[in-house]
């Protein structure tokens, strides 16, 4: 049974649900986590997560299938990415089994908020790992909190699967060379807020960031990854140590090759070579796929497939991926975890 909400017009915003998961790391080990109705985190005013940004987060979704069951999409990959981020920030890893079991517990406890099949809406999960305790000085915490909360969401970008325009930004960088760009840390997103506002004020959906070293290559699209489709049936995505490795992107790389017969390519995407792409888009957990109609760079505006219509290959990839996520298309082995 589900609650009564306007599922098809949810948007992407916070909603307080009855239950979330909470676990503490103390004395060198994780304590047993539990579900709680308390949506407030209790931590010291001197916690390193507040002062020095020792925090990491993830994002994944639960999907209602046609038969009414609920499933998660590749949660083990989110666990592994959080572990890599934790290593980068000197935080304890959350074991994969603990992570996946906690996700399943949160979904099960809030199952009435998993949107009905056919609405296009999903239950978004936000795992969060933060350093807490009485610490002053730039050093790792002794204690940590791992928590997961959930909320039903619609489309991240207004309008869903429709082309929108993006602003190529070469005055601001998302991450520094050899910095934390490949980790999912809050500081990367804080740095993107100001250039993001510039783009939104100019009626662009988001920012496309260039490589911080030369400003000649595309890296990320705001909070998503960039991809391009060539006339030679290639699926191309940027490759850089300062790009967050997107689970959605790597899923699309696999599907492009094994389901659509395309050639997957990870490599440099130069801004002076955009004519090679007949279609382009942004992809990520929140956005899924957002077709890019055109991009503004300085005084130049470049259109890919169309500013009003979704390209045929982008549509096929979207249908294949969402079909797997909602249980309508057979998934590659290990991609789907059922919530019992």
Spans of model-derived segments:
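Extended, Lys/Arg-enriched charged tracts that mediate electrostatic binding to polyanionic substrates
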Residues: 116-130
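Helix-start/capping segments and mature chain N-termini
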Residues: 1-102, 106, 128, 135-340
């Amino acid at each position: 049974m589900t609650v009564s909400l306007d599922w098809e017009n949810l948007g992407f915003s916070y909603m307080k649900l009855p239950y979330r998961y909470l676990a503490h790391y103390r004395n060198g080990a994780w304590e047993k986590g539990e579900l709680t109705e308390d949506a407030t985190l209790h931590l010291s005013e001197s916690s390193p997560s507040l002062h020095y940004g020792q925090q990491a987060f993830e994002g994944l979704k639960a999907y209602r299938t046609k038969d009414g069951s609920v499933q998660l999409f590749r949660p083990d990959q989110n666990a592994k990415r959080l572990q890599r981020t934790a290593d980068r920030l000197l935080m304890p890893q959350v074991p994969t089994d603990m992570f996946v079991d906690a996700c399943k517990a949160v979904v099960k406890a809030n199952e009435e908020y998993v949107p009905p099949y056919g609405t296009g809406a999903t239950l978004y999960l936000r795992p969060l790992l933060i350093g807490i305790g009485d610490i002053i000085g730039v050093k790792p915490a002794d204690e940590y909190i791992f928590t997961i909360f959930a909320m039903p969401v619609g489309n991240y970008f207004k309008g869903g699967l429709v082309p929108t325009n993006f602003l190529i930004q070469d005055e601001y960088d998302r991450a520094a060379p050899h910095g934390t760009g490949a980790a999912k840390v809050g500081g990367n997103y804080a740095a993107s807020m100001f250039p993001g506002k510039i783009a939104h004020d100019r009626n662009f959906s988001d920012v496309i960031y260039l490589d911080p070293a030369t400003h000649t290559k595309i890296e990320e699209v705001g909070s998503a990854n960039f991809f391009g489709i060539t006339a030679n049936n290639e699926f191309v995505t940027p490759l850089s140590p300062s790009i967050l490795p997107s689970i959605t992107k790597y899923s699309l790389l696999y599907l492009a090759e094994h389901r659509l017969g395309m050639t997957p390519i990870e490599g440099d995407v130069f801004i002076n070579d955009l004519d090679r792409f007949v279609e382009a888009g942004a992809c990520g957990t929140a956005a899924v796929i957002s077709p890019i109609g055109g991009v503004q760079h300085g005084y130049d505006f470049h259109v890919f497939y169309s500013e009003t219509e979704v390209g045929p290959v982008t549509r096929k990839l979207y249908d294949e991926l969402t079909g797997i996520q909602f249980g309508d298309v057979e998934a590659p082995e290990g991609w789907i975890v059922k919530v019992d």
